[in-house]
Regions:
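Extended recognition/assembly regions associated with phosphoester-bond processing machinery
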Residues: 1-487
């Protein structure tokens, strides 16, 4: 295909707007400017999470266990059957500590990142806490459950002579209400008084999802990106692949589009840099490499506007580190931003552009289905707490806990929310995805009220060459591969 040239001002406004079957929600957008503060205490987040989810968990537990509730975890009595609601806290000796951060600040060699926080000898402890205090938990059922710090649960059991609560069973909030298909678009039409467009007919489109491009600026990266662009646009591959590509209505890139940044330099390397040449605009121009962002920008421009793009930041991308990560700045994409919503329309209800840089996590409606997903950091952090390697089961647990990032802020950096926690899941998605996982996987889970969610673990494209396609009518998932054969 031919890339579109010229500035955004020369392109008709209508052509820069995204197709009507797409709505991006601002669920995870942080306050702007002076309204964004980092002086709050993180402890308030867990209290806020408990306050918001406790009534829901209590309702589910009361239906199952009836009249055995005690209001506070410290009100349990030895030998008496009862149930309590609280926040799980995992005491693990291998979890990162504040001293590790201090070591980094003072140029002391910090311990390498751990693959798991759980210790092989099983010395970790599971506790439940509320505003009154903490209570240690034990019991066989704990081994059958995925539990991490920050999950809100109800536990039934008795306190033993050691003051430990022996758990017989555990209940969680489970999946929340699932909106009907096209709910956002139909609501917007009703509010505006506009007639509903004829967009609800079966389209047979595909929504493409990809993660982990990890562009480093090498020649191999450029060749792989060109193959990917040609495949998505139907210019490469057999008739079957071309037919699938022709139906792609949107591409969602779920984080880690750029390769990992350079490691923190040693004291000697830093001193050598200071003795080196002059700096321009505050950085050493000789060590700056713009090729990764240039290649990503060129790739996006090559598929826009044929395929609209939703771009999530990831752990290795130039965005804020803490969750929720804010959209990548349009200045990084001088070519692709032609197709983004113009700054003049930011304050208007104009909808997103064909190129839509969004937050991580992100929530939106695509082809009428509610999508919710992230660049994968919350799932990867939950993985460190448990013995299991089943990423899809972890994703299912996060949905049933109704929390996008339960381990934040304990071991996953996040913004210190005070009045509301947007990381809580209030609407059950139809498709829930996590980027940058070790391998592709998909599963369908169901809720107590008939909710049905398609879980998708997205592999790193850099390692697998895999692109995931979701059918816009059936939500069936399939994979196509873009292989670079070296001779």
């Amino acid at each position: 295909m031919t890339a579109v040239e010229g500035s955004g001002d020369n392109i008709p406004a209508a052509s820069r707007e995204a197709p009507p079957a797409y709505t991006s929600l601002s669920t995870f957008e942080l306050p702007k400017g002076e309204d964004r503060h980092y002086v709050q205490q993180y402890a308030d987040m867990y209290f806020l999470r408990l306050v918001q989810l406790k009534p829901v968990v209590e309702q589910v537990a009361a239906e199952a266990w009836e009249n055995y509730q005690v209001e506070r975890v410290l009100d349990v009595r030895q030998g008496e059957l009862c149930w309590v609601v609280g926040t799980i806290y995992m005491e693990m000796p291998l979890k990162p500590k504040v001293l590790d951060d201090i070591s980094k600040e003072h140029w002391i060699s910090a311990p390498p990142p751990r693959e798991k926080y759980i210790s092989p000898d099983g010395t970790h402890e599971t506790m439940i806490e509320d505003e009154s205090g903490r209570l240690r938990l034990t019991g066989r059922c704990l081994k059958d459950q995925i539990l991490v710090t920050g999950a809100i649960i109800a536990a039934i059991g008795t306190e033993n002579s050691d003051g430990v609560f022996e758990v017989a069973d555990i209940i969680v909030a489970d999946l929340p209400r699932q909106p009907a298909r096209w709910e956002l678009e139909d609501s917007a039409s009703a509010v505006s008084g506009k007639s509903k467009k004829d967009t609800h007919k079966p389209s047979g489109n595909k929504i493409a999802l990809i993660s982990g491009l990890q562009i480093s600026g090498s020649a191999t990266d450029l060749l792989q990106l060109n193959l990917l662009a040609e495949t998505l646009c139907g210019e490469l591959g057999g008739p079957e692949v071309a037919a699938k590509a022709a139906t792609i209505s949107r591409l969602i890139i779920a984080g880690d589009s750029l390769a990992d940044a350079c490691p923190i330099p040693s004291r000697e390397e830093l001193a050598a840099t200071k003795r080196g040449g002059s700096k321009k605009y505050g950085y050493d121009a000789s060590s700056y490499n713009a090729a990764p962002t240039d290649h990503l920008d060129a790739f996006l421009e090559s598929i826009l506007p044929t395929i609209p793009v939703t771009l999530l930041p990831g752990q290795t991308d130039p965005a804020n580190v803490q969750i929720p990560q804010q959209p990548l700045h349009p200045a990084l994409f001088p070519k692709a931003r032609t197709w983004a919503r113009s700054p003049a329309k930011q304050a208007e209800d104009a909808g997103p552009g064909t190129f839509d840089p969004v937050t991580n996590p992100w929530e939106g409606e695509v082809e009428g289905w509610r999508f919710l997903g992230s660049g994968g950091q919350p799932v990867s952090d939950v993985f460190k707490y448990v013995e299991s390697d089943d990423r899809l089961e972890m994703m299912a647990s996060m949905l049933r806990w109704r929390c996008n990032a339960p381990t934040a802020p304990d071991t996953l950096w996040c913004y210190p929310f005070q009045d509301d926690d947007p990381l809580l899941i209030t609407d059950c998605p139809h498709v829930y995805f996590a980027g940058n996982q070790p391998a592709f996987g998909t599963r369908i889970i169901e809720g107590p009220a008939g909710q049905e969610v398609v879980l998708i673990a997205l592999p790193r494209f850099k390692e697998t060459g895999q692109v995931v396609l979701v059918d816009s009518e059936t939500r069936e998932v399939e994979v196509i591969e873009v292989e670079l054969v070296e001779k």
